[in-house]
């Protein structure tokens, strides 16, 4: 399976529709894509073929299902972006992110809990 970073925005947009609707018939996916993104049938099938070839979806008798959960793909994509833009430094990423706006008290508590949950012991 290909790396998530090889998924252009158009492929990620189609993946979002698939995750939200799966299993979804290809004709229904075309309708959803037209409604949500203004894409023609040929555009949807071109993108869909790329996703099948990359191993992100299965097209079984015109029924489309994903092969990877949304959370996994988004996590991989985030990790690759942090690696590319911040040299893999999570503190640098958080500094850049937090410099734009303050966290609410609830958001800060949630982040502290996540850090505690994922901190290595020893």
Question: Positions of the model-derived regions?
Answer:
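Short helix-coil-helix linker/hinge
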Residues: 7-10, 23, 87
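Short acidic, hydrophobic short linear motifs in intrinsically disordered regions
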Residues: 24-33
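Short, cationic-aromatic polyanion-contact patches
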Residues: 3-10, 62-82
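Short, hydrophobic-biased segments on the C-terminal half of alpha helices
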Residues: 45-49
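Pre-recognition alpha-helix immediately N-terminal to the DNA-recognition helix
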Residues: 12-17
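Amphipathic alpha-helical dimerization/coiled-coil segments
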Residues: 79-121
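A short, conserved structural fragment
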Residues: 52-62
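Short helix-to-turn junction characteristic of helix-turn-helix DNA-binding domains
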Residues: 18-22
């Amino acid at each position: 399976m290909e790396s998530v970073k090889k998924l252009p925005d158009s492929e990620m947009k189609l993946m979002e529709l698939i995750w939200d609707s799966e299993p979804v018939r290809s004709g229904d996916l075309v309708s959803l894509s037209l409604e949500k993104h203004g894409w023609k049938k040929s555009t949807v099938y071109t993108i869909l073929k790329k996703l099948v070839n990359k191993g992100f979806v299965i097209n079984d008798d015109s029924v489309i299902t994903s092969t990877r959960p949304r959370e996994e793909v988004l996590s991989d994509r985030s990790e690759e972006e942090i690696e590319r833009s911040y040299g893999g430094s999570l503190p640098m990423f958080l500094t850049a992110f937090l410099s734009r706006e303050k966290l609410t008290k609830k958001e800060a508590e949630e982040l502290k809990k996540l850090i505690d949950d994922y901190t290595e012991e020893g």
